Amino acid sequence: MSEAVIEISDLTRRFGATTALDAVSLSLPRGAVYGLVGANGAGKTTLIRHILGLLRAQAGSVRVFGRDPVADPVGVLSRLGYLSEDNDLPGWMRVDELIRYTRAFYPAWDDAYAEELQKTFALEPSAKVRSLSKGQKARAGLLVALAYRPELLVLDEPSSGLDPIVRRDILGAIIRTIADEGRTVLFSSHLLQEVEQVADHVTMIHAGRILVSARLDEIRESHRVGDRVLSLDEIFVARVGTPLRAPGA
């Protein structure tokens, strides 16, 4: 097994009487797509906030690239790209200004790749960020998260609420990043069909606890019913007892 990009050991986080993460342990080696799946409130975003160094571990430990993200934020964040569902970009900037602004923080910024992504995502350079649709903002956020070719890309529900075409664009960019450059992606979502399309490894989290964490093919093989291989949706129901999302939700 290759060196772990993320190493989490017995991580626990409580907010008052609520246990958001309960002795969570994960090891993510380099060069694959990891799907982190669970319902809203399951602990996905809290886990990601620890990885980003936004929360300090109350118990247990978090290491990213072998570093403590709280103690060494520059050493971690300079090698990490991040896109969230909120995608809070400065609305007063134009797209080209957003690119130039972000570029200044990353010596490894790849101008040619940024231009390629801009064309792929059909983003008008002179357009104000505030005038972009939700889907266009997601593409702009993904562009600036990818263009410096981070070793680790963390996506927290990046396509929630977006139309299928935009989701396909985002997933396509993830696949290219991994397939072409051998980088690592941690992809958080409650859309299990989406995760099945791109993930090599899947971690299911429920009520702050890890239910299962393994290669997707191993998870599906271990949940075979006769000759039929269950989908992730069906596996989640088998593990938890209720669907992740109600039909049509």
Write out the residue ranges for each language-model feature.
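ABC transporter nucleotide-binding domains
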Residues: 3-8, 13-187, 192-193, 197-206, ...
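Conserved beta-strand-loop-alpha-helix hinge in the C-terminal portion
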Residues: 209-233
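C-terminal coupling/interaction segments
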Residues: 2, 224-249
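Signal for well-folded cores of large energy- and translation-related assemblies
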Residues: 81, 175, 220, 236-241
